[in-house]
Regions:
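C-terminal recognition in membrane/secretory proteostasis and scaffolding
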Residues: 1-12, 35, 226-227, 261-378
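N-terminal activation segment of mature serine protease catalytic domains
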Residues: 2-61, 70-75, 87-88, 264, ...
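A conserved glycine-rich beta-strand in the N-terminal activation segment of trypsin-fold
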Residues: 27-35, 72-100, 122-127, 150-152, ...
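Terminal peptide-recognition signature
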Residues: 42-47, 65, 89, 99-103, ...
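Active-site loop architecture of trypsin-fold serine endopeptidases
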Residues: 56-57, 111-114, 148, 168-182, ...
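Gly/Ser-enriched beta-turn/beta-hairpin loop segments
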Residues: 56-61, 68-84, 119, 131-135, ...
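Conserved active-site neighborhood of the chymotrypsin/trypsin-like protease fold
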Residues: 84-85, 91-175, 329, 333-339, ...
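Gly/Ser-rich catalytic serine loop of serine hydrolases
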Residues: 85-88, 151-155, 207-224, 308-319
Length: 378
């Protein structure tokens, strides 16, 4: 007789009864990213912008009807604070009873009061030490007693395109506090136009570009490297192009080296006193090649620089700089555009003298300029 074989094998992923089971396999899930996150996470906070509640005309009418428009209850209602917006910040220094937080200026702008929420959920009142709308940075202070971790800064000049970048913050608000996203450095120095909350242009900023996800609420939080060092402060994302084309993976952070110089001065003075030439400028690349020859009379070998469009009464005028002069060097170092010119100037202090190399009617000249304050420091 022919015998049929029967299998007694248990289906893969099942126990002897045929039920699906899970395996408890021990693996080392620790990675450079998770270690870096653990190093910094307790220094990252949510920043709550509190503003006075706007009681409408309806409330005033009802109060008038019931004869208590001037009552204390009405006054307390008009003074009630509510959450206007939320962002992120990072604790970077403890000094005695005070801890200092860096965040974005636009996160705290317009606030009547501020709160921070620590990584463990504890709420603390915060006060503004100083703000700077040009770089979109602000420094806050809180009681240092609950602070267990302080972040350290890395050298943003040494980052490389393609290296891992991690963004930490509260995307969409404190409900998602201490969220981590991972990407790479897409560009080390990207020049973008900046504007304030009213949409008015405030100049240009040189920022780090990353594809680590950055959303509303991430503003003010840290961009870190795999060593757990802060290499930038997340500031903005590009969500659409000029033609309304949807854009993904384009976030920007203020480089740590610039952050450190700004926040140190904010703690010291409460504001930034920037040196200036006393001119308005435009990139040479914005001028057509025909105009470069006919109006600026530039040699064809000159491909980078910043064109003076107007000269105010001040140091540049005293030094002999004129409209349509093309600045190509500061202190002997070539500059390719207005952003690099400003970067070179901002390394100096008000009252310093810098050597400006420029072309006037096609001839290269140099002049010494004593720097003055900018018209607006905030």
């Amino acid at each position: 007789n022919r015998m049929e074989a029967t299998t007694t094998a248990v289906p893969t992923g099942s126990n002897k009864s045929g039920e699906t089971q899970t395996s408890n396999v021990k693996v080392n899930v620790s990675s450079q990213s998770s270690k870096a996150f653990s190093t910094v996470k307790d220094s990252v906070v949510s920043v709550i912008n509190l503003q006075k509640e706007n009681t409408g005309d309806t409330d005033n009418i009802l109060n008038s009807i019931f004869g208590d428009s001037e009552s204390s209850s009405s006054k307390s209602s008009s003074d009630k604070l509510q959450t206007a917006s939320e962002g992120s910040g990072v604790i970077y220094k403890k000094s005695g009873n005070t801890a200092y937080i860096v965040t974005n200026n636009h996160v705290v702008s317009g606030s009547n009061s501020l709160e921070v929420i620590m990584s463990n959920g504890k709420k603390l009142p915060a006060k503004i030490v100083g703000t700077d709308s040009v770089t979109d940075l602000a420094v806050l202070k809180i009681n240092s007693a609950p602070v267990t971790t302080v972040a350290s800064f890395g050298d943003s000049d040494n980052i490389k395109v393609g290296e891992t970048a991690l963004a930490i913050g509260s995307p969409l608000g404190s409900e998602y506090a201490t969220s981590l996203t991972q990407g790479i450095i897409s560009a080390k120095k990207r020049t973008i136009e900046t504007s304030n909350s009213n949409g008015q242009g405030t100049g240009e900023a040189t920022v780090i570009q990353t594809d680590a996800a950055i959303n509303a609420g991430n503003s003010g939080g840290p961009l870190i490297n795999l060593a757990g060092q802060v290499i930038g402060i997340n500031s903005m994302k590009l969500s659409s192009s000029g033609s309304s084309t949807s854009v993904e993976g384009m976030g920007f952070a203020i480089p740590s080296n610039e952050v450190v110089s700004v926040i140190d001065e904010l703690v010291k003075n409460g504001k930034i006193n920037r040196p200036a030439l006393g001119v308005t400028l435009v990139d040479l690349t914005a001028i057509s090649s025909d105009q470069q020859k006919s109006i600026l009379k530039l040699p064809s070998s000159v491909t980078g620089g910043s064109v003076i469009m107007s000269v105010n009464a001040g140091p540049a005028k005293t030094a002999g700089l004129k409209k349509y002069d093309v600045v190509t060097k500061v202190d002997g170092k070539s500059i390719k555009d207005t952003a690099e010119l400003r970067e070179a100037l901002y390394k100096h202090k008000v009252g310093d003298t810098v050597k400006i190399g420029y072309y006037h009617s096609g001839k290269y000249k140099t002049t010494d300029v004593k720097l003055t304050k900018t018209a607006s420091t905030n």
